Regions:
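Divalent metal-dependent hydrolysis catalytic cores, especially in the metallo-beta-lactamase
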Residues: 6, 71-79, 89-113, 139-146, ...
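Catalytic pocket-lining loop regions of alpha/beta-barrel enzymes
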Residues: 120, 133, 137-141, 146, ...
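Flexible loop residues that form catalytic
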Residues: 12, 104, 177, 208, ...
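Mid-to-C-terminal alpha-helical segments outside catalytic/metal-binding sites
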Residues: 2-7, 16-70, 74-78, 82-98, ...
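Short acidic, glycine/proline-rich loop/turn micro-motifs
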Residues: 110-114, 230, 341
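Short catalytic/ligand-binding loop motif for oxyanion handling, primarily in non-cytosolic enzymes
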Residues: 14-17, 99-101, 107-112, 150-153, ...
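Histidine-centered catalytic micro-motifs
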Residues: 7-14, 202-207
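Active-site-proximal gating segment of KS-fold condensing enzymes and close homologs
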Residues: 116-132
Length: 372
């Protein structure tokens, strides 16, 4: 019998360079490709697009001060980011019993050329991820991807989540873009309904901040700009929660589960307190028709993942221990690998054992269907 003591609810993979070689022939010229540069390997998401280097997507095993010093390629990156056997070995080193894996470059699916190639890439990725997890399904679960809600009036997202479910994927990541349809848009309703019917949690993962994406290269190079972006990127999560709560998405789909991934948890209590205030004081004249306090909805339908978040853990009662899931973020720059056990013990110092177990194992194991 499998015993789950530590489960990472948010780690990552790096998609293999040949992942999209079998997309329909008519779309092959539009498919993402890996190109090797002097600075390392990079994905080109669409013809003429700027390269997205894999440099910070596979740093596990390197010293922090060396992250950007040497080119990172598929030949020298940690193999656990794309090979299941190597993955399990790295999990053993880190004392992880199970791992929930998010996409790498496919987090940027919205940057592909058009609706058709985005759907084809989603299908290719979801099939590959399902096969990856078959290597050891008692320890590996993969998060699928679905295209933007904008694509084909939302129909592509519905098709992708149904395809992923048929392949055995148990949860999906929703692709988004600046200026795209908001999560409370009527066109999103068929997708939320499909996720609810399929009993598949939907993940909203942190992205780069809108502020950074609007900067010119010379502005981005100014000292402190990148550090600011990494510091504040978690705060964007509150916008997604607010839209879904006050937009009535949770009310219309009471069995829908949403995971807010890698955004930490320290912001959640302050957001919920403010949202409850808005519910009582401002909602009556602003027009939202929701009937339940946002803090109550959160406890029923929302989850959040975090790595090291002592402030959030201290305020855990304000959001519900059952909604919180620890993560290692392997093999990215925020990763706790290979010292997760040591970091967990420090981060959770003074937390009752039963509550700690829920946050570092039980909640994720239950949500993603790991079987003991």
């Amino acid at each position: 019998m499998q015993n789950y003591d530590i489960v990472s609810a948010d780690s990552h993979i790096n998609e293999p360079p040949d992942l999209f070689m079998n997309v329909p022939q008519a779309l092959k010229e539009l498919a993402p490709k890996v190109v090797s540069y002097e600075k390392g390997d990079a994905w080109i998401m669409a013809p003429g697009a700027e390269p997205r280097f894999v440099s910070t997507s596979a740093v596990a095993g390197r010293k922090k001060e060396e992250y950007l010093k040497e080119p990172v390629t598929y030949a020298n990156m940690c193999k656990g980011s794309f090979d299941p056997e190597a993955r399990l070995k790295d999990m053993d080193i880190d004392n992880l019993d199970a791992d929930v894996m998010y996409p790498g470059i496919m987090r940027y699916l919205e940057r592909c050329a058009n609706d058709d190639i985005r759907l084809a890439c989603a299908h290719a990725y979801n099939e590959w991820m399902a096969d990856f997890c078959k290597f050891n399904p008692s320890r590996l679960q993969g998060i699928g991807v679905v295209p933007m809600l904008d694509d084909n009036g939302g129909k592509n997202a519905v098709e992708a989540i149904k395809f992923a479910a048929k392949k055995g994927i148990r949860s999906v990541f929703l692709s988004q873009r600046d200026g795209g349809l908001p999560l409370n848009h009527p066109s999103a309703e068929p997708f939320w309904a499909a996720a609810e019917e399929l009993n598949m949690p939907v993940s909203i993962h942190i992205h780069t901040t809108p502020f950074l994406r609007g900067l010119k290269p010379e502005q981005l190079a100014l000292m402190g700009t990148k550090e600011m972006g990494i510091t504040t990127v978690t705060l964007c999560m509150s916008e997604h929660v607010g839209l879904m709560m006050f937009g009535g998405v949770f009310m219309r789909h009471p069995k829908l589960k949403i995971v807010f991934a890698e955004g930490g948890i320290g912001w959640v209590p302050a957001f919920l307190e403010r949202a409850d205030h808005v519910f009582r004081v401002h909602k009556p004249y602003l027009g939202s028709t929701i009937t339940e306090l946002p803090s109550e909805t959160w406890r029923k339908q929302c989850y959040a993942t975090f790595q090291e978040d002592v402030a959030g853990i201290r305020l855990r009662d304000m959001m519900g221990v059952e909604t919180l899931m620890w993560a290692s973020d392997y093999p990215h720059t925020d990763t706790t690998w290979p010292d997760s056990k040591k970091i967990i013990d420090k981060t959770f110092a003074g937390v009752p054992a039963n509550e700690k177990h829920k946050m570092i194992s039980e909640n994720a194991a239950r949500l993603y269907g790991f079987k003991s």
